Amino acid sequence: MIRYFNYECAQEEALELAKNSLLDLGYKIDLMAPEGYFMVTKMQGVKKDIRQYDFRIAVLVEDRVEVIIVAQRKVFKRDSETSIGGKDLIQTEISDKLPYRLQRSIFYPINNEFTKNGLVKVEDITFGAND
């Protein structure tokens, strides 16, 4: 769940462009490390069917701008045990895979906003591919 973008400016400026793009989309920045060219947004929740997914966006600026979805899903446990208050009925699992439809709904607005701000999406990241 990674997308890559090329940039033709300084690393600091590319990080600032990415930050402003995410802020324009309504994300809130949780952690920003300008000296490491890295930032992470606050956790956001989204429902798909009966599952709830929480995700955050991580951005790392190196040779390219890497946009990564870090996600976890909440799963309803169907155990025979009962709990008072129901707090143990939901289990959180780290998920490195989100449904494709959900990935698209997250990445499409980011792609559009980054492109509008001068960051160009890399279509082919394989070795030997022309930039």
Question: PLM ranges: what are they?
Answer:
Residues 1-131:
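Ser/Thr-rich, low-complexity intrinsically disordered terminal regions
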